[in-house]
């Protein structure tokens, strides 16, 4: 979203039309503008004998082209892990160092692009359902790394008394007024693409649509059992889910859309990584299972910014873009966190955090072709964070023409796994589910509206917010109607349902 945000709705519709025609390559990621420097290459090594993961994008979207690529994968000494014929994307594993060049040669003109999805070996190995020619390799276990993320500020609460009065965030965006009209429809489902939703939490146990829930962290293959989508090492998704849809049941808190349903779509592995194949699976499952809204409080690893002018990064970014566009075409609208680096998304120059699954990230030059995905993809609502005073949270990314709307994200009380309790977290990850919840109320009140209409109305209804000051990052520029900190303004739940 390096360009202005006003025409994004039109571009969303155009992208959906292109997918429908099966000419996805026309919308592929592009390079930097002529007056920008080329981004710094980050070579990714795929040595002989290491299980490496790849995405392969077909030139034309058709089952025949996908089958051609699948045969090429096998001929090149690889294994097909998952195919998505709807978007012309194949996920493959291989232990061959020359896999990329060989698969392109074997597929001839069927391949638009092929690239790695990680800078390290596949830690989970190849799924049992995929017949790997080299046997059941374990892959290489990697060291869990800390990336710029959200901050937990509290521990589990043991009290079962209602805590709605502590939810200043709901008051700020007029949720109580909205609830006088609707608390959400059980026919509307929100996909929480995250680390999983606690299925036993008293505020969430009745809110999860188990039939639509899915896990995507087994190399990008969907799995539907509870063990695949329940949280294991992180309560991030549980906290996000509480903001969206915690039940009004006399205990704990109340979510924005307690009358709707949520699907747990697990895209975060036990090391805390969200690789491209996981995200592709999550978006595709959202579209296939008829989810109306998704929340995406993450960026796709291992790059904080994926650069379209780099041949090793562009293919994975393209695969995620195709999945987002296709699911949007199915009627799913997506909200995403802007990020927690206090970065100006409209003025990209350098980055030193990627690849974050390696021991040593690379300091690199970046440009406008480099995108934080999924939040900077067309058709995704990009959400910045505000604090209790209505100012931009110091950690929040910003950028004129890059932010759509703002929502509360500092010291947000919501559900956590520890003790099936409640705790505080801060981050744009906490802001985005407020917008996902509002979109859920909007869909409940206006069931015939599609993604383009919903995004347009969400932005038009947002409360104009003048520039504020913050202790970190670029200063605010723009007008109260649209600026680099708040986009079109603070999201308004009441306006969304009227």
Listing of model-derived features with the role each one plays in the protein:
Residues 1-32:
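Secretory targeting and sorting signals
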Residues 32-36, 40-47, 81, 120, ...:
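C-terminal subdomain of the subtilisin-like protease fold in secreted/lumenal serine endopeptidases
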Residues 35-37, 42-44, 60-63, 67-165:
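Autoinhibitory propeptides
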Residues 109-111, 185-189, 258-263, 288-294, ...:
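Loop/turn elements at helix/coil->beta-strand transitions in domains of secreted/extracellular proteins
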Residues 148-259, 281, 287-315, 346-349, ...:
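Active-site core segment of subtilase-fold serine proteases
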Residues 186-189, 193, 222-266, 275, ...:
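Active-site alpha-helical elements of protease catalytic centers
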Residues 267-374, 418-433, 482:
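Substrate-binding/access-modulating region of protease and related hydrolase catalytic domains
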Residues 357-444, 448, 456, 490-498:
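Extracellular S/T/G-rich loop segment that most often corresponds to the catalytic His/Ser-adjacent loop
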